[in-house]
Amino acid sequence: MRKLLLVIFALGCLATGVVIHDGALSASQDIPRESKVQPKEVVLGKDSQSDKYGEVPFNHETHSTKNYSVDGAGVLGCVECHHTDQPAAALKPPLKTSERDVVLTAAALAAADAKPVKSCRTCHLQAGDDSATIPTVTYAGKTTPTKLTNEVSYHLNCNVCHDKAIAARPALKGKVPGSNDCLPCHKPVS
């Protein structure tokens, strides 16, 4: 009977998206291709190609509602990560793609006529996925373009933001992972 209850509990967790992270229950979800609903938490890199570093549980709600801006004075703007969700005039190099006439905000997303937000993987595919053209950028001083795969894009975006926050607020050092601190974010591959 006990085994049956455990099986039913496990199946219920799978069906509702409840998972256990380090012994704590949390609601996590797969990242849909596009959505008008902000997730609480998503798991990035479920298909990580690294033999050392695995997935990254990412708390979207915390990053989008707390004072996580570089200077700590406000919340992050949606376009800090969802960079295509702003007007073309607002884009800063090397960004080129714009998919909105207004800057994405939580209020704009809640509007009845708002377009859904696309997932990163819509453009930034996993290395080796040739189903679409992966964006590239040639950085100043470089001759070879960098292919902005999903992994490269996440690392650039997350690391640059974290490093800038640590530089702006030295008290964060050791509390917020920087570019060289992999395991605070990544689960080790077992």
PLM features: what roles do these ranges have?
Residues 1-4:
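Positively charged n-region of N-terminal signal peptides that target proteins for export
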Residues 17-18, 24-28:
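Boundary at the C-terminal end of the N-terminal hydrophobic targeting segment
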Residues 18-19, 91:
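Residue-level signature of transmembrane alpha-helix interfaces in integral membrane proteins
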